[in-house]
Amino acid sequence: MTTFGTIEQAMAEILAGRPVVVVDDANRENEGDLIFAAELATPELVAFMVRYTSGYICASLTEDDCDRLDLPPMHHTNQDRRGTAYMVTVDARKGVSTGISAADRARVIRLLADPSTTPDDLARPGHVVPLRAREGGVLRRTGHTEAATDLTRLAGLRPAGVLCELVNDDGTMMRVPDLERFCAEHSLVLVTIADLVMYRRRTEKQVELVAEARLPTRHGDFRVAGYRGDYDSAEHVALVMGDLGDGRDVLVRAHSECLTGDVFGSLRCDCGLQLDTAMELVAKEGRGVVLYIRGHEGRGIGLLHKLRAYQLQDKGRDTVEANLELGLPVDARDYGTGAQVLYDLGVRSMRLLTNNPAKRAGLEGYGLTVTERVALPVQSHPENERYLRTKRDRMGHLLG
């Protein structure tokens, strides 16, 4: 049986200058990262990390610190499949030799964590990889990048952490049984990102319920709840029907905003049909939630960028090709704020209305349980045939 530590134990270890091991969800990377506080970096800690990890040492920083230190993205289009935000690599400009030694890397890591460091103190490129953590931490993105800044901040230190993936002697990634043995051998605390999410949920609130009212629709009467996110400032809406707190799984649709499909009835996508069908199914069941997530227009690229992508699609590109040609991610959505709204409404386990497996994984990463994926019907016609085919063949949607 795997023995995980508590987040409080991990915080105490980090504050004492010791590393911890953090593992993410089995549906995500399913990897364990060695993490310690950047401001407490020593040559010994870096050497230990190099010995037992891939050696690709990263330093997770807040968005503000990345901007203050003039750390631009490694590439203008982030095509990393997990959305890890790699910045241009750095070394210390002074006080180092080649930059690759444990002592040299410990020095630049401490510089990155020091609020008095200026852009001129850093040389580019270098041997340490800064990562840009999402504002809101693991409540916005359940990655090791955000776990590193969250744990150091919660420990009372600067929100800057050092991280690298633990590997076996043969170079394969350590999974939970390997991580458990490693932690036992080296007396390290092992925690999960899911537990960090739950800890922050217990101690912090990231969404605010602003207003509630009755909303009569052609599908029946819903209770409409309006929320504002603390970090994204977007205004999200949940249509609620029935009692959500009776212990049964809740039928849920987490719907991404789509002005063209939801409001104007565009035939280029199936968004409007999915929204209407979700409301109908929840009303038929008499219990459930239709969550309308703002800021997801065009899979997160925004309305005007979506219209630019439409221009390219009119010239023969598919929806994936168009985004990439514009230098935009294929899918920039995160479900952290939406998951917090569902949690605040009382949802703990759900039957999720979606054809997109990534949406299921996105919500489960925030401590919600999806017991069943409920497929939504698909209507193919000449205007959306290629779009649906691309979603199925290139984005992994389950369209039957």
Swiss-Prot record:
In the N-terminal section; belongs to the DHBP synthase family. In the C-terminal section; belongs to the GTP cyclohydrolase II family. The gene is ribBA. Keywords: GTP-binding, Hydrolase, Lyase, Magnesium, Manganese, Metal-binding, Multifunctional enzyme, Nucleotide-binding, Riboflavin biosynthesis, Zinc. Pathway: Cofactor biosynthesis; riboflavin biosynthesis; 2-hydroxy-3-oxobutyl phosphate from D-ribulose 5-phosphate: step 1/1; Cofactor biosynthesis; riboflavin biosynthesis; 5-amino-6-(D-ribitylamino)uracil from GTP: step 1/4. Mg(2+) 1 binds at E29. Residues 1-202 are annotated as: DHBP synthase. It comes from the Bacteria. The record marks H127, E165 as: Essential for DHBP synthase activity. Pfam families: DHBP_synthase, GTP_cyclohydro2. Binds 2 divalent metal cations per subunit. Magnesium or manganese. SUPFAM superfamilies: RibA-like (SSF142695), YrdC/RibB (SSF55821). Mg(2+) 2 binds at E29, H144. Zn(2+) binds at C258, C269, C271. GTP binds at R253, A254, H255, S256, E257, Q274, E297, G298, R299, T319, T354, K359. GO terms for molecular function: 3,4-dihydroxy-2-butanone-4-phosphate synthase activity; GTP binding; GTP cyclohydrolase II activity; magnesium ion binding; manganese ion binding; zinc ion binding. This is Riboflavin biosynthesis protein RibBA.
